[in-house]
Amino acid sequence: MAEAPQVVETDPDFEPLPRQRSCTWPLPRPEFNQSNSTTSSPAPSGSTAANPDATASLASASAVSTDFMSNLSLLEESEDFARAPGCVAVAAAAAASRGLCGDFQGPEAGCVHSAPPQPPPTGPLSQPPPVPPAAAGPLAGQPRKTSSSRRNAWGNLSYADLITKAIESSAEKRLTLSQIYEWMVKSVPYFKDKGDSNSSAGWKNSIRHNLSLHSKFIRVQNEGTGKSSWWMLNPEGGKSGKSPRRRAASMDNNSKFAKSRGRAAKKKASLQSGQEGPGDSPGSQFSKWPASPGSHSNDDFDNWSTFRPRTSSNASTISGRLSPIMTEQDDLGDGDVHSLVYPPSAAKMASTLPSLSEISNPENMENLLDNLNLLSSPTSLTVSTQSSPGSMMQQTPCYSFAPPNTSLNSPSPNYAKYTYGQSSMSPVPQMPMQTLQDSKSSYGGLNQYNCAPGLLKELLTSDSPPHNDIMSPVDPGVAQPNSRVLGQNVLMGPNSVMPAYGSQAPHNKMMNPSSHTHPGHAQQTSSVNGRALPHVVNTMPHTSAMNRLTPVKTPLQVPLSHPMQMSALGNYSSVSSCNGYGRMGVLHQEKLPSDLDGMFIERLDCDMESIIRNDLMDGDTLDFNFDNVLPNQSFPHSVKTTTHSWVSG
């Protein structure tokens, strides 16, 4: 191996030659290496070492090949060098070695070189013309300019130009993709040896790319099945140069077109909607546009026009927050106030809602689960008052919205309401009511289920302290005129019903006075399952225990057996919920008996205004819970029960 260079030195004709590189871009020009084949040995030979001319030719050949590659890659920079007024140092060094100022150096540069003349190398026909020593300067740039004008390895034609020639050369002016490949291999010398699959991958991909890139080529579907499409020239011309890709351009155009179509469709729809309404104003046809000035002309004004009816409808159902001033509007009629405050949804309900004196009606208890629909007729209750001629019993009828028809009136506004409770009852307001003054035993008929929003006024305007007393259980069969006890087991159990002491109703309805009485006996056969009592207004009492009210029979006869003046409580006697049991309002006398003079009657520890504003006006629940339970008190009236038929309608 070490002697190999010596063998080469003895026989310079077999020097190693540089092998051309294949499948590279840009391809090196073979003529420059072939021209220098005799002097391109990497190993110095004896003849070349002894011959200075051979050494100079070797240096010049290496400089030419190196300078060619630099000029091929940096064509613009070399042209700048040619336009320079003088030789650059690199070009001067190359010229000193090979007798040239540069590939693109003109005679105007004025460069002087002292290199000895050398014979022109011989090469193949494709080799650029040799530069003679005398005309080396003016002819040096000619081959380089020719090579720089070539756009591709096969010439100045681009792929698009080659494809155009291929399609135009066909008889039908159309070719398939495979036919274009074949034409390239046959017609272009550069692609003759690149028809195989290994070397054709690059240029075939370029052809496909150019076919789809340029708009001058169009694809036509082939008639036959399973055949590739025809590629033709666009008859409308199209762009021959590079244009944006169809896919990107179509995406942009489609998105913009879709937006414009959407705007046009909206405008058309708005115009049509405006034309459909003949009575609308001219600006109404643009009402659907959110940014138009007339966009709020129709829809929003309709909403504002229905604002007041909506609030009034909310007021009609206790679901909305009501103002307490509503009940104090004097200019409204009774029926008007009732229609605004109380819900009209109860179809079978009477025109007025019940007072606390009518809570004991079984029609209310029977239908409490049916949204307070009164499905039963009012029952009868006999209240017998026996007193001396000097005694006067003042009872108050329930306030009704209907005009007062009663003829029994009294200047005294005191009145009492007697109720019983198994559920939470809202306090009944105070209103001026008729009083019953009678020295005889009379029957005060219970009115129907009548109540009023004016009862709220009573809560706000009451002066005397409200009393919620739990009556002590007293034997109902024994009359105690001296002890002045109002019995009937006032704190009602789950199976007992305390009837209300009704008063003369505004409608003067006597409730079945034909009930037979048993003065000495009281049958408490009423069974109230759970704590079921309706509210004054749309309230849901303790529904967990309020299952069903069975028909009850409760006898009651109230003999008032000693002279007195029994006046009702000045404000109200409310039945409220305390552990599910109602408490009966007590008769408050103008003068307490001697045994009760020192007893302090506690005032309810609650703010009625806050209760009205928060609980009653908010609607859903009107369940008043007064936690203070007053001690049992006895009052100067004995109660005798009479048999009374509580038969539901």
Curated annotation (Swiss-Prot):
A motif (Required for interaction with SIRT1) lies at residues 456-460. Coiled coil: none annotated. Residues 277-557 are annotated as: Sufficient for interaction with NLK. The record marks 152, 159, 219 as: DNA-binding. Gene3D superfamilies: Winged helix-like DNA-binding domain superfamily/Winged helix DNA-binding domain (1.10.10.10). Residues 154-248 bind DNA. SUPFAM superfamilies: Winged helix' DNA-binding domain. Expressed in the internal elastic lamina of the carotid artery (at protein level). It comes from the Eukaryota. InterPro entries: FH_FOXO1, Fork_head_dom, FOXO-TAD, FOXO_KIX-bd, TF_fork_head_CS_2, WH-like_DNA-bd_sf, WH_DNA-bd_sf. GO terms for biological process: apoptotic process; autophagy; blood vessel development; canonical Wnt signaling pathway; cell differentiation; cellular response to dexamethasone stimulus; cellular response to hydrogen peroxide; cellular response to hyperoxia. GO terms for cellular component: cytoplasm; nucleoplasm; nucleus. Residues 116-135 have a biased composition (Pro residues). Keywords: Acetylation, Activator, Apoptosis, Autophagy, Cytoplasm, Differentiation, DNA-binding, Methylation, Nucleus, Phosphoprotein, Transcription, Transcription regulation, Ubl conjugation. Pfam families: Forkhead, FOXO-TAD, FOXO_KIX_bdg. Residues 357-453 are annotated as: Required for interaction with RUNX2. A motif (Nuclear localization signal) lies at residues 245-247. The modification Phosphothreonine is found at residues 24, 327. Residues 303-320 have a biased composition (Polar residues). Transcription factor that is the main target of insulin signaling and regulates metabolic homeostasis in response to oxidative stress. Binds to the insulin response element (IRE) with consensus sequence 5'-TT[G/A]TTTTG-3' and the related Daf-16 family binding element (DBE) with consensus sequence 5'-TT[G/A]TTTAC-3'. Activity suppressed by insulin. Main regulator of redox balance and osteoblast numbers and controls bone mass. Orchestrates the endocrine function of the skeleton in regulating glucose metabolism. PANTHER family: FORKHEAD BOX PROTEIN O, FORKHEAD BOX PROTEIN O1. This is Forkhead box protein O1.
